[in-house]
Every structure is written in structure tokens, then in C-alpha cells.
Amino acid sequence: MSRVDFDQYAGHYEAIIAAQTNFFDGDSSYFARYKIELAHQLVGPVESVLDFGCGIGRSMPHLREIFPKADIVGCDPSADSLAIAREQNPTCRFVSMEELGADSRFDLVIASCVFHHIPPQDRQMAIRYCYSRLKECGHFIIFEHNPVNPVTRHLVKNCPFDADAVLLSMSETIERMRDAHLKIDKSSYCLFFPQQLAALRPFENYLRWLPMGGQYFVCASSRKRDAVRAA
């Protein structure tokens, strides 16, 4: 399977995302904001954040709003995506993985729907890389598509830049993070209710055990920390 070249999609990535997610919420930024708000619930305020696989920087406005004092850095292999991200988010820094200094460490590393693009044989190396970027007591949160959800599978199958996607289950993600010596703090399913059922969204916390959310998250830390908050 050939790898997707995200430089080819950078200029119209936003339009593709909007078309793909319109059925769930007319505001295509809903997903990005949802995840950053959830990250804040999980770990509280932080001084530094790395968005691993940041793409065109769709999470950056929400990271800047919710973590206003943090040093926020995005990294991505797509140079064209980084160029767009820099233009649209002047208060954040954007670098390639090669440009990220060897000593750079962060309180929080987020990877949002990144790992299904990474070949399975390379995933452990990518998780270890993210682990190596954590400060002591830092947190690493992976958000991923839920392969158990049939709607999610349909969307991935029909998304042009998911042509190389190999979905990974929550159990695989947890196992890989544990193998990298991360402590699992919390794992749950999320994104259950579309905009038409927005009145039910406050009840998602009671359904996080149910493997029918559109996505899931796993929050882990670089060592035991009792201060992780329930979300």
C-alpha cells in the first residue's frame, strides 16, 4: 500500500474534513475543540504542548485558547501543511520532526488521529519517540478512530487521505503504550452524539465504557502521577 502524501491535500484539507464530518456537526472545528477541552479535563493546565502530527494546525487555535500561557509546538512530516499552519497560527511554533531539538521536552504530547497513518511495524517506534519528548510526569494522549464503529469505518474507507489507513483498536494502543513504559491513566470511547442529538452530549461521560463512540482516547503518563483528573 502506497503512503498518502499529505502535501497533495494540504491546500484543501479543511474542505475535505468539513465534507466528511458535516453529518455529525456542521461546525468542522467541533472535533478539534472537543479533544483539546477533553485533554484539559484530563491533565489540567500545562506549560508546554507538542501536537505530534499537527497537519495544517486545526487544533492550534483551541490549544492557544485553552492553554493560553503554554509554549505550543506542532510537528508534521508535511512541509506544505506546516506552511499553512504557520500562516494561520502565528503564536505557535511549527517544525519538522528533524528540526525538533533533541532536548525538547513537553508537559503534554497529543497525537490526534495520527497513528492509523503510521504503518503497524513503525507504531512502536513512534510511540517511543513521543515518550522521549515528555517531561518527568508528562502526559501523552492518543486520540484515534474507533474501528468497532461502522460509521467510522465507512468514513475512513471513503476519505481520500485515509487511503493508507490501518485502524488500530484501543487495546492495541494501550498495549503499545505500556510496552513503551508509559503508565495508562485513563482510556475511554468518545464522540457519541451528532449535532442533532447535542442535548445528549453532557451524558457522554456515562457512556465512555461503550465501544460505539466514533473515536477513543488513551491518556498515559511518563511515571505514576496521582493528580490525573477524572474526565
Where is each model-derived feature located?
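Short alpha-helix
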Residues: 166-181, 187
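Conserved class I S-adenosyl-L-methionine
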Residues: 1-43
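A C-terminal cap/extension of S-adenosyl-L-methionine-dependent methyltransferases
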Residues: 185-231
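Conserved beta-strand signature within the Rossmann-like core of class I S-adenosyl-L-methionine
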Residues: 137-144
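A conserved beta-strand element that flanks and buttresses the S-adenosyl-L-methionine
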Residues: 110
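A short glycine-rich, Lys/Arg-flanked "PGG" loop and its adjoining helix->strand segment in the class I
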Residues: 124-136
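Short, glycine-/aromatic-enriched active-site segment of Class I SAM-dependent methyltransferases
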Residues: 146-163
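Class I SAM-dependent methyltransferase SAM/SAH-binding core
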Residues: 58-99
